[in-house]
Curated annotation (Swiss-Prot):
Organism: Arabidopsis thaliana (Mouse-ear cress)
Domain F-box stretches: 8-54
Keyword presence, Aminoacyl-tRNA synthetase: no
Highest taxon in the source lineage: Eukaryota
Entry protein name: Putative F-box/kelch-repeat protein At1g19930
Coiled-coil residues: none
Amino acid sequence: MKKNKVPTELIFSLPNDLLVNILARVSRLDYPILSLVSKRFSSVLTLPELYQTRSLVGLTENCLYVCLLSSRADRIPSWFKLCRRPILASDTRKSSGYVLATIPIPHSPPLHRSSLVAVGSNIYNIGGSISQSQSSSVSILDCWSHTWLEGPSMQVEREYPSASLLDGKIYVTGGCRLTFHGCGDQTDNVVVDGKLHSCGGYKGVAYNPNDGRWDSLGSEMNLGLKWSSSCVIENVIYYYYHNENIKWYDTKVRSWRTLNGLKTLPRFARYANVRLADYGGKMALFWDKFTGCGNQNRMIWCAIIALERRNNEEIWGNVEWSDAVLPHQVPMAYVCEYVVAVNV
């Protein structure tokens, strides 16, 4: 029996409110592909009403935003988001099916030496360095419209601050005092067990917002987090340090353990730029590979890792896929500075 196909003209003649309701139920990973269907689809996919509908019907998703920064003086940021890749009939290369799609975001504020934190569908850009001076500014990226808004300034200027979200509030530490390196005093914040853990130097402290108490963590938690990458997934801290394995922190015995099961991943170069992020309970891992004559360019790679706790002393990672996700090489001057998971 022959199936009846819906005429293309019928789809394109749908009123905007109905089209918004339909597209709101499609995974946001597919939006870049849908934007290629027609100018009208591309226009509807930018409407705030679309994202309001997604929120109302409970269909928001974790979306990974990636920011590449140039070492040039102007520090122009380039923004991307992870999405599904259009598969062409002529494609012969085995692919994960994912790619970093460019996001045109005009009038981006400086992001050099600042801290980014996601709050709902927004990304807060806090502090940093503007014209080689510490900044107290706060700017907000609306990930529905991809426009920047000016937020309330901090009372203190901060360079290399660390920001975390806890109970609906953003806590910012560090970055106030200039050291002899010309950088702010540096800490790294993570939220575990409902407490803000702040590590800097050789010791750390934990802040409990319920009773306002600060408790010492000692030195066992600190591994120089500021110079690598860390994230918290389902109340467990994960951490990467140059040329080492990915580790997780066992709060019961207060020690770091190696994340098992990642033998299919390559060994990262000593000075590779590695970033970790919580991607809906899985680990998103980004790193770069040097290419070209004299390692003049970089390729940006990504792996999505499912995590499984097998007993109290072991966590295993299963690499679901890994692939080069930027379709082209980038000059050595560009680094993957930030990876942020946003609910949109």
